[in-house]
């Protein structure tokens, strides 16, 4: 009965796709309430007219929604909060970083807290058995790292391999061989995978879940592992005659998987010569390598022998011919590996790199961001002052504009960093805007990389804006990027100050200093000197001079609050001069006169401009004693302006006889010191002759 019903239904379906004529059309008109078409199908005639036909039924394909599709839709309706720090930090004023150093410290603290929580959960799993998450979240539940199978069997070996217990897996394998048990080829290959991936060493983790009652042998092994960490800064190296080689030699039967695993492990741990020799053995046994093994062999060919470029390039081409002979289709990583290796040869590899790029497009492989990153770095020559080789970035951006990318290569997150670096070296702001627009397209922002890459990208981008853009646009970018996107370095703030100077917008300087303090640049001497120099260089309206004086007082407090051992060397004469001048111009004369004591205390020479303004201030207040103090300061450092200041005191102030004698003595001392210095210079000249 079911078969008959199915046949009738198929017959009805086949008739629905044919034009309705005659009796069947009339039948359809009698039953207009019946819908045998999907919602997307339409009638060819309006109801009430002669129906000449119906479009074929189109059943829409099922749409599979992501579990977080609703959250993604909601997230697309809002933009980044430009007034807040990055989202990774908690919404707590005590946990919000104010500088790049604090952000790194907070991220490390957050990761440390996660590791501690995982350690507690996995150390005491019996207290965390209640699963309150709906749906189930596996990473929140305890993980069991200790083997449950105690007997000597192949199942126990498989369990230890799955738990990534390197030493325990090797011990179990040896016990099986001693017991006369034959281990299957599949299990042995899995053990080789484990050994080759970790270089025959226990995998390093941020936390270790060891039982408190571990044996002495295991404790000694952990001590040995900790001692080796100092020598493994740049990764684990392949040791000769290690367990992987020993087990590989003991295998009675080896297949392609066995050879490929060993070759990839040797290349990963920088045993390039051994990998190439093992590939020769694979060919002698008439076996074939897979595409991932060929990718590793390409890297080994470039890194193994110190040969010329032509010889290494010919060997790479030979490996590619082997791939064709073995009917192995290259993938994206094959071409990216070639391009990455070609970067070692700089100018010589440019033409082959373009050939590789054309070849991968010809066989239908879409380049990834890492592909273009390697091309950019290959054509970018830091020693070329004209940057002629960097112009390839324009062709790359014309090809990439508007595209959305998905992760395909581990080096994909380096593209935007290298592209913005080229924009900065070319001083091309329009190109930088194109790169930034590509970053904001779709989910491309995820490829900006880790924290240090993001800081590098945005610092280069904003520095170029400060150099090339109008000041109003620059300030808008400043509000948009800082601190929500990244925390600026002190040099970035200096570039912004220079942009304000060019645009004659010095009234923004007090705000820049306030922001600099929040970002942890209070004790950056180069930044403080730049701010003081810009404020004290010219005279400004009274209200602006008052704001500048307040800023100068704040900087003076910063100098005084730093460690005592740094105070003397961090009080440059330029800063003392600028602070005193700013105090004078704002009418804060008492604070300005107090600055004179700092010149003597730190043995710093005042500038003539400051001494003249101090003399003007003394004249306004009609204070001969202050005027004489200025002369004394100039005389103490034997400045040439001392004589001119003395004449001004004699002509502009009413002084008594005692003050005249003091001035005469100061002038005499200055003359004697000038004579001594001139005689010393003459004697030095004669000796030189």
Swiss-Prot record:
It comes from the Eukaryota. The keyword Oxidoreductase does not apply. Residues 673-689 have a biased composition (Acidic residues). PPR repeats lie at residues 149-183, 184-219, 255-289, 290-330, 331-367, 368-409, 412-446, 454-488, 489-523, 572-606. Residues 665-689 are annotated as: Disordered. It is found in: Mitochondrion. GO terms for molecular function: ribosomal small subunit binding; RNA binding; rRNA binding. Component of the mitochondrial small ribosomal subunit (mt-SSU). Mature mammalian 55S mitochondrial ribosomes consist of a small (28S) and a large (39S) subunit. The 28S small subunit contains a 12S ribosomal RNA (12S mt-rRNA) and 30 different proteins. The 39S large subunit contains a 16S rRNA (16S mt-rRNA), a copy of mitochondrial valine transfer RNA (mt-tRNA(Val)), which plays an integral structural role, and 52 different proteins. Associated with the 12S mitochondrial rRNA (12S mt-rRNA). It is linked to Combined oxidative phosphorylation deficiency 51: An autosomal recessive, mitochondrial disorder characterized by intrauterine growth retardation, low birth weight, poor overall growth, progressive limb rigidity, delayed psychomotor development, hearing loss, and optic atrophy. Brain imaging shows abnormal bilateral signs at the basal ganglia and brainstem. Patient cells show decreased mitochondrial complex I and IV levels and activities, and generalized mitochondrial translation defects. Mitochondrial RNA-binding protein that has a role in mitochondrial translation. This is Small ribosomal subunit protein mS39. It comes from Homo sapiens (Human).
């Amino acid at each position: 009965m079911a078969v008959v019903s199915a046949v009738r239904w198929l017959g009805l379906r086949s008739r629905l796709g044919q034009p309705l004529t005659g009796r069947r059309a009339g039948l359809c008109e009698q039953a207009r309430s019946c819908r045998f078409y999907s919602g997307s199908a339409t009638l060819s005639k309006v109801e009430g007219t002669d129906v000449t036909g119906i479009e074929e039924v189109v059943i829409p394909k099922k749409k599979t929604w992501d579990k977080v599709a609703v959250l993604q839709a909601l997230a697309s309706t809002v933009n980044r909060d430009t007034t807040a720090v990055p989202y990774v930090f908690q919404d707590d004023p005590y946990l919000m970083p104010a500088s790049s150093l604090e952000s790194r410290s907070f991220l490390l603290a957050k990761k440390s807290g996660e590791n501690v929580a995982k350690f507690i959960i996995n150390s005491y799993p019996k207290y965390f058995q209640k699963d309150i998450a709906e749906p189930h979240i596996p990473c929140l539940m305890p993980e069991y790292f200790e083997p449950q199978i105690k007997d000597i069997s192949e199942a126990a070996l498989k369990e230890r391999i799955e738990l990534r217990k390197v030493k325990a897996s090797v011990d179990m394998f040896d016990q099986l061989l001693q017991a006369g048990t034959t281990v299957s080829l599949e299990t042995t290959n899995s053990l080789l995978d484990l050994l080759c991936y970790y270089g025959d060493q226990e995998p390093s983790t941020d936390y270790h879940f060891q039982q408190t009652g571990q044996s002495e042998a295991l404790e000694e092994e952990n001590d040995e592992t900790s001692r080796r960490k100092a020598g493994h800064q740049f990764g684990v190296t392949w040791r000769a005659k290690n367990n992987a080689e020993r087990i590989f030699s003991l295998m009675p039967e080896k297949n392609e998987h066995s050879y490929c695993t060993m070759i990839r492990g040797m290349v990963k741990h920088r045993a390039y010569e051994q990998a190439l020799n093992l590939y020769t053995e694979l060919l002698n046994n008439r076996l074939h390598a897979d595409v991932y093994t060929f990718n590793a062999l390409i890297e080994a060919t470039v890194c193994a022998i110190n040969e010329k470029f032509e010889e290494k390039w010919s060997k790479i081409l030979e490996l590619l011919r082997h791939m064709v002979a073995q009917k192995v289709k290259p993938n994206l990583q094959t071409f990216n590996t070639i391009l990455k290796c070609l970067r070692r040869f700089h100018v010589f590899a440019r033409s082959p790199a373009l050939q590789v790029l054309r070849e991968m497009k010809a066989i239908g492989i879409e380049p990834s961001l890492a592909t273009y990153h390697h091309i950019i770095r290959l054509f970018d020559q830091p020693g070329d002052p004209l940057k002629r080789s960097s112009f390839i970035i324009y062709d790359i951006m014309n090809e990439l504009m508007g595209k959305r990318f998905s992760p395909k290569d581990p080096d994909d997150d380096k593209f935007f960093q290298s592209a913005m670096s080229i924009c900065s070296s070319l001083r091309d702001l329009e190109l930088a805007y194109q790169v930034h627009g590509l970053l904001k397209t779709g989910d491309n922002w995820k490829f900006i990389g880790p924290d240090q890459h993001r800081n590098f990208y945005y610092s280069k981008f904003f520095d170029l804006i400060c150099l090339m853009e109008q000041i109003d646009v620059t300030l808008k970018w400043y509000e948009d990027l800082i601190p929500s996107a990244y925390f600026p370095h002190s040099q970035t703030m200096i570039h912004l100050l220079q942009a304000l100077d060019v645009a004659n917008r010095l009234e923004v300087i007090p705000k820049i200093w306030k922001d600099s303090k929040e970002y942890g640049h209070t004790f950056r001497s180069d930044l403080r000197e730049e701010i003081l120099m810009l404020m004290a260089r010219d005279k400004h309206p009274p209200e602006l001079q008052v704001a500048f004086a307040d800023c100068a007082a704040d900087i003076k407090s910063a100098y005084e609050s730093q460690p005592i051992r740094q105070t003397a060397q961090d009080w440059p004469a330029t800063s003392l001069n600028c602070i005193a001048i700013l105090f004078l111009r704002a009418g804060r004369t008492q604070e300005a006169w107090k600055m004179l004591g700092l010149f003597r205390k730190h043995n710093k020479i005042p500038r003539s401009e400051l001494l003249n303004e101090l003399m003007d201030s003394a004249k306004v207040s009609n204070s001969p004693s202050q005027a004489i103090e200025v002369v004394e300061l100039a005389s103490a450092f034997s400045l040439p302006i001392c004589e001119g200041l003395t004449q001004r005191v004699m002509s502009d102030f009413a002084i008594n006889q005692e003050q005249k004698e003091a001035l005469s003595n100061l002038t005499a001392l200055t003359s004697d010191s000038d004579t001594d210095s001139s005689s010393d210079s003459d004697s030095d000249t004669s000796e030189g002759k």
